[in-house]
């Protein structure tokens, strides 16, 4: 069967549902899918039922297995990819490894319970790993008849968001009932449409990868006799034109060069675009001047660093991780983009050790500099096997 062509007529936005266990994230996701499929029928808006979303397929991201569901739908304004993870651990792993980069998220809070422990944990994580916008779905609102209670829960959630650096005062809070909307109730179907209108309006259009400064991690280096050195990789973002000046950053001192040719599938190109696998011919660069693990970037856009604060999830023994805890001064490899660099971990004050299965904040000192930005993901490896994964939260030096 031929794959449906992806129509680029609307802006594309990645979102997800976050929040405490059993507050109705998956039910609400299914309700959004149902209501949109009925009210805005299209090829994209195909109803996904609860079970299909709940039995999330396994994905591997930086060596960690995560159960995660992806569904797509569209409003009149936009096309959305929506991620939902069934278990709490899957959420944490998803957010820390950036398995699904979110442009914004719907925080689901049950009106019957208010904000709970995992609500707080997800909001904190969303801030740390750089989810830029949240809005609130006050779910199970059909089960609370007292207006005062609804207002109190809303106030509490707004305060929680403000505490963690979100704009709690102005965040949209929409009262919904995922279950009632899923059962076809007209009033609660309207509430889902109101929620989607709030998503359309409060989560800004993301900056497309193509509009960001060019970056390509080097995967391989070749010499082409008579022409020079070619580096290959997949352009992560930006657009690069032939004869542009670039910098090669990481591992060694930063060097400037000019890209004199761009090739993809043995064809000459004028430009390399985000998402494309290409070879870049570098002027006056020797084969031994560059190596896997460095990145080719727009000059001045990314700098090399060795010390950072990160947030990491350490695999449990059952997930193929370590069998015993580790302590400060643990020296694993940190896998950034295409290469491993040894680093020394310092644990936060008051944390003696880290057990397999823990989520932690760490300070890391790398023995070689890496082209680094906040939000960059990494795997933690020991002798080639993954024992954890994380995200750079703050660059120190």
UniProtKB/Swiss-Prot annotation:
Q: Does the keyword Magnesium apply?
A: yes
**Gene3D superfamilies linked:** P-loop containing nucleotide triphosphate hydrolases (3.40.50.300), Translation factors (2.40.30.10)
Q: Which GO terms describe its molecular function?
A: GTP binding; GTPase activity; translation elongation factor activity
User: Positions of the region G5?
Assistant: 177-179
Q: Where is the tr-type G domain?
A: 10-207
Reactions catalysed, semicolon-separated, are: GTP + H2O = GDP + phosphate + H(+)
Region spans: G3: 84-87
Q: Where is this region: G2?
A: 63-67
Provide an example Pfam family for this protein. GTP_EFTU_D3
Residues holding Mg(2+) = 26
Query: Subcellular location, in the record's words?
Result: Cytoplasm
| Top-rank EC class of the record's enzyme | hydrolase
Q: Which HAMAP family match?
A: EF_Tu_B
Q: What does this protein do?
A: GTP hydrolase that promotes the GTP-dependent binding of aminoacyl-tRNA to the A-site of ribosomes during protein biosynthesis.
Q: What interactions and quaternary structure are annotated?
A: Monomer.
By sequence similarity, the record places it as follows:
Belongs to the TRAFAC class translation factor GTPase superfamily. Classic translation factor GTPase family. EF-Tu/EF-1A subfamily.
This one is known as Elongation factor Tu
């Amino acid at each position: 069967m031929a794959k449906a062509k992806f129509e680029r007529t609307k802006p594309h936005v990645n979102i997800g549902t976050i929040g405490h266990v059993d507050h109705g994230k998956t039910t609400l996701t299914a309700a959004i899918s149902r209501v949109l499929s009925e009210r805005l029928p299209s090829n994209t808006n195909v109803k996904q039922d609860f079970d299909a979303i709940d039995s999330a397929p396994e994905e591997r991201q930086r060596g960690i297995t995560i159960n995660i569901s992806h569904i797509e739908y569209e409003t009149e304004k936009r096309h959305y990819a929506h991620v939902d993870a069934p278990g709490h651990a899957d959420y944490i792993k998803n957010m820390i490894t950036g398995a699904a980069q979110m442009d914004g998220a719907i925080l689901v809070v049950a009106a019957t319970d208010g904000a709970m422990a995992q609500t707080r944990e997800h909001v904190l994580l969303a801030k740390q790993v750089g989810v830029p916008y949240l809005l609130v779905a006050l779910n199970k609102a059909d089960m609370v008849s007292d207006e005062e209670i609804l207002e109190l829960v809303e106030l509490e959630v707004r305060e929680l968001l403000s505490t963690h650096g979100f704009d709690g005062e102005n965040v949209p809070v929409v009262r919904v009932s995922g279950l009632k909307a899923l059962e076809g109730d007209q009033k609660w179907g309207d509430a889902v449409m109101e929620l989607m209108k709030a998503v359309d309006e409060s989560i800004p259009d993301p900056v497309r990868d193509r509009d960001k400064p060019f970056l390509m991690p080097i995967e391989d280096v070749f010499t082409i006799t008579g022409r020079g050195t070619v580096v290959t990789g997949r352009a992560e973002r930006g657009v690069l034109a032939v004869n542009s000046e670039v910098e090669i950053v990481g591992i060694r001192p930063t060097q400037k060069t000019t890209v004199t040719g761009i090739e993809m599938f043995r064809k000459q190109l004028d430009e390399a675009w985000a998402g494309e696998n290409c070879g870049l011919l570098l002027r006056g660069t020797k084969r031994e001047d560059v190596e896997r693990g460095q990145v080719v970037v727009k000059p001045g856009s990314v700098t090399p660093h060795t010390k950072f604060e990160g947030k990491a999830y350490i695999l449990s023994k059952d997930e193929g991780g370590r069998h015993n805890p580790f302590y400060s001064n643990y020296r694993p490899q940190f896998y950034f983009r295409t290469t491993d660099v040894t680093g020394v971990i310092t644990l936060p004050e008051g944390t003696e050790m880290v057990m397999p299965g823990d989520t932690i904040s760490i300070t890391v000192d790398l023995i070689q500099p890496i082209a680094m930005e906040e939000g960059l993901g990494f795997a933690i490896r020991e002798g080639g096997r993954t024992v954890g994964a994380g995200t750079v939260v703050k660059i120190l030096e």
